Amino acid sequence: FQFNEKTSPFDVERAYPNIFEEHAIMIHTDYSRETGKVYFSIRDKGIGISMDEFKRNILTTGRSWPERKEYQDEIKRMPEWLRPTGAFGIGLHTVFSVTDSLTIRTKSDSENKANEMTLYSGKKGGYAFCKKTNQTLQRGSEFSFSFLLTEELKEWVTGSNGGKLFLENVNDGIQKEIKKIMETWC
């Protein structure tokens, strides 16, 4: 099976039944009433992040996919809907708008061991700590962080007290589910 510009998700599913279920992006959230913190993690089974890739691309915001030469042939063969969307660190900036630290656990095919990176926001000095780990991980990455769910954030997320609903542009079904979960927490 060869990917090309005209490959659709349906073509992929026919060639590889259950691929989307087996390689789904997993999002996990938890809330502690005792601490008032929300714990959030996103796990994928993508290409992972090597230590070199981390140093060259994640520590330098604004470096886009076209500059990542090692992936260019692979990306060009991908249909547009499958190409990477991240590029400029906007996701990282968003995370650091609610928390001071982010932990990334990742395994790349180009390395024998997994990596663990902890990034701290500019408010905490902007440090990044990286280490190889003996932890057994499948190829892919997990990004995890926690944040205190303040009254202001509760209002921002749920739209209570006449506030602007943060989730208003999200698909209605997803919006209702997220709002239901947040209202349960709050």
Across the structure, where does each feature detected by a protein language model lie?
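Glycine/threonine-rich ATP-lid/beta-loop region of ATP-binding domains
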Residues: 108, 138-186
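GHKL (Bergerat-fold) ATPase N-terminal catalytic module, capturing the glycine-rich phosphate-binding loop
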Residues: 1-155
